[in-house]
């Protein structure tokens, strides 16, 4: 990772510690005044206004993302949109300004008040870098984001021949989560085409259930059991491959030199994979996680260090259905632990993941991660120590943003009028195969990938656009080598191919969900 992410990023070393006069601080007398709000102590979406003229402390999740960054691990995720057609610089720059006005946190820096990090009043617009991929060094493109000096959002626009473009959005995870970044992208394209972005909506958040429909024990008892299991389970890292394995795939090196590898499946294969998942009564996400788990085990076996225990960190959105608002983090984490014996049968592995995923969603169990984080954040030094422990907390991160097309296309239209740039819908589907940002500019694909941290050496993200499955892979090149992402991507593709060819799950799911 050092090849892309260089520079010192200590806990506070790169953040300018500013005097009290250099930022606004909300006082009790101001708390009830117009323009001020009280922040949720955990992670909820609290900004209701377009502009925030006040400062609030970072939520525990935002603080964790800030604290966990270090040299080579900047805690940034990436979203990439590929376009065909002319992209006008001034029009794009104006769209960035307009879209950012709806998302104040994209304009904020981080300072410190009484020893704790706070968001400063919006004063930094996201930067846009127009580059020629042939001549620009990757260390210039993908440098870390210093939240003490600049916005946590950066655009890198890479020009390719024949009016092709790669627009990469690099976001510090303290700013927002992946779904919020997709909506920010959607607002940008709405502004680019002189349309009105979709209105913000804040439906009521569903409450947790006391008992999961599929769980035979009370939720609290199961949580205690899973917490103890988490503490006793020590996942193994991905092992560095030998020189022979590395040389075998040297030709797969990323020619555009992004930190991550991207690939997409054909519409026919994507449909076959979804159909196989449907026949097995599981979701596409369950199949993808199972395929990644088998690929992780195959990786270590090929490296000569067979793993017995793996853990996948699964980001879980806590949004209410239909919610849309200013960019922020509204998510938690769930952890899926499996042994190598659990992964022998792909079908049984997929069913066990499906059972656990349903329990997690039904109980909103990912919120318990935030509850724990809120307690730890009262002692920042303890949180810092935990993030610096020389142990592997997760083998890999696997995220799924789902069908991104509706979020990208979200814009307001006059009653009775359709999107003038949307192509005709074929076969009765609600989402066209391609979508035009403007009359002459078309989105051809979209990828995303979450950040990694020391010990968690791989990150995988799945998106669906135009009926096709898109996947991006990010690996720790310091530990695994320069072509690690390309090699792991091949293994995941092979596992998904086997799933599409013969996923027939007749075995009953596990009685107790294993998260």
For every predicted segment, state its role:
Residues 45-113, 135-153, 298-515:
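Acyl-thioester-dependent acyl-group transfer interface
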Residues 85-103, 169-186, 262-302, 471, ...:
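Acyl activation and transfer enzymes in specialized metabolism, enriched
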Residues 6-12, 20, 29, 47:
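N-terminal amphipathic/hydrophobic targeting modules at extreme N-termini
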Residues 45-62, 67, 175-179, 183, ...:
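Non-catalytic, low-complexity flexible loops and terminal extensions
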Residues 3, 7, 37, 41-44:
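Short hydrophobic alpha-helical segments enriched in small aliphatic residues
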Residues 93-196, 261:
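Acyl-thioester-dependent condensation/acyltransferase catalytic cores
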Residues 4-5, 23, 36, 51:
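Aromatic (phenylalanine/tyrosine) cluster motif
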């Amino acid at each position: 990772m050092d090849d892309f992410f260089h520079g010192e990023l200590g806990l506070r070393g790169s953040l300018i510690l500013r005097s009290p006069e250099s930022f606004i601080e909300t006082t009790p007398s101001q708390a009830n005044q117009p323009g001020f709000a009280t922040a949720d102590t955990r992670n909820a979406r609290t900004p209701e206004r377009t502009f925030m003229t006040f400062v609030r402390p970072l939520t525990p999740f935002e603080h964790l993302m800030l604290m966990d960054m270090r040299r080579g691990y900047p805690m940034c995720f990436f979203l990439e949109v590929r376009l065909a057609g002319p992209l006008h610089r001034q029009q794009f720059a104006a769209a960035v300004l307009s879209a950012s006005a709806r998302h104040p946190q994209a304009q904020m820096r981080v300072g410190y008040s009484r020893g704790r990090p706070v968001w400063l009043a919006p004063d930094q617009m996201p930067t846009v870098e127009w580059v020629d991929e042939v001549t620009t060094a990757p260390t210039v493109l993908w440098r870390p984001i210093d939240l003490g000096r600049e916005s946590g959002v950066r655009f890198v626009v890479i020009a390719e021949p024949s009016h092709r473009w790669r627009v990469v959005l690099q976001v510090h995870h303290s700013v927002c989560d992946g779904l919020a970044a997709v909506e920010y992208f959607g607002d940008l394209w709405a502004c680019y085409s002189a349309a009105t972005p979709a209105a913000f909506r804040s439906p009521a958040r569903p409450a947790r259930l006391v008992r999961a429909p599929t769980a035979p024990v009370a939720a609290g008892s199961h949580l205690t059991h899973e917490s103890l299991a988490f503490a006793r389970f020590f996942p193994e890292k991905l092992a560095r491959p030998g020189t022979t394995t590395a040389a075998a795939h040297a030709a797969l090196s990323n020619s555009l030199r992004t930190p991550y590898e991207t690939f997409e499946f054909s519409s026919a294969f994507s449909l076959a994979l979804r159909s196989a998942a449907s026949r097995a009564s599981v979701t596409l996400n369950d199949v993808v996680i199972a395929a990644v788990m088998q690929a992780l085990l195959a990786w270590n076996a090929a490296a000569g260090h067979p793993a017995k225990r793996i853990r996948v960190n699964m980001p879980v959105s806590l949004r209410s259905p239909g919610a849309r608002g200013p960019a922020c983090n509204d998510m938690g984490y769930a952890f899926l632990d499996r042994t190598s014996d659990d992964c022998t049968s792909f079908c049984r592995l997929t069913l066990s993941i499906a059972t656990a995923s349903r329990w997690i969603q039904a109980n909103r169990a990912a919120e318990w991660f935030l509850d724990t984080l809120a307690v730890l954040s009262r002692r920042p030094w303890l949180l810092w120590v935990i993030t610096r422990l020389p142990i592997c907390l997760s083998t890999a991160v696997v995220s799924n943003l789902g069908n991104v097309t509706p979020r990208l296309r979200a814009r307001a239209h006059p009653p009775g009028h359709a999107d003038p740039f949307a192509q005709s819908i074929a076969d009765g589907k609600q989402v066209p195969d391609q979508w035009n940002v403007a009359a002459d500019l078309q989105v051809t694909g979209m990828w995303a990938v979450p950040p990694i941290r020391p010990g968690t050496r791989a990150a995988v993200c799945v998106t669906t656009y135009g009926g096709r499955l898109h996947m991006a892979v990010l690996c720790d090149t310091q530990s695994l080598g320069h072509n690690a992402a390309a090699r792991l991507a091949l293994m995941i593709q092979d596992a998904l191919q086997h799933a599409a060819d013969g996923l027939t799950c007749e075995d009953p799911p596990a009685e107790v969900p294993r998260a």
